[in-house]
Amino acid sequence: MKQTRRILAALLTLICLAYCFAAAESAVFTETPLPDPSAIHSFEELPWYLTLVNAQHGVPENWVIPAFTELKHSQRVDSRIYPQLQKMFDDARAEGILPVVLTSYRTYEDQKNMLVKKYRKYKDKGMSTEEAQAEALKVAAYPGYSEHQLGLAVDIDSADTEKCGNDTVWDWMKRHCQNYGFIWRYPGQKSEITGISNESWHFRYVGVEAATYIMSNQLCLEEYLEQVYGLK
């Protein structure tokens, strides 16, 4: 009986340590005070499809998307953008282009777990807490500050790279996306404004009117919102 109690006590200790370790890793990303997403996202005058999410503008954990449409590979998007996304893909395929959505909507919890996973990866390489945090944030945003939490953004690759390479897919998307209300969200030349380095695969729905203006004038979303709505 005593041995059983000792085993149970040891197991409880291990569980508590594991929980505390995980909580500490998650908490490391909140040690530096961040803007409250619910406070900074006060753009009621903006249409839903122009919601801005970047390092300065976030959405709260309880951000509501009215309805989702399921895609292949366990992906899903805001149902309001699905018809245009599907039409864009259908038209691309008619021209021999083979796009597929690799990443779309992420929950707040998904984003948090992704960030912690990246942090652990760098810690395991021997980096300090500060170094690991800095490296993790280069490839994963704080929860609430990723466009993927809007359900309006998709990462697109080729469904068959032997028949149609990724670059071919991305080039087609960049030339035609505005016709369907999408923009190439993170061009390399706009990285100082967006805070994101070149991502040829990341496309974001903003509506046909805004997309046409943005792509025709080689703007990023931040520049468009400043010009049209005075948002900084």
What is the predicted function of each stretch?
Residues Y19-K232:
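Extracytoplasmic cell-surface/polysaccharide-interacting catalytic and binding patches
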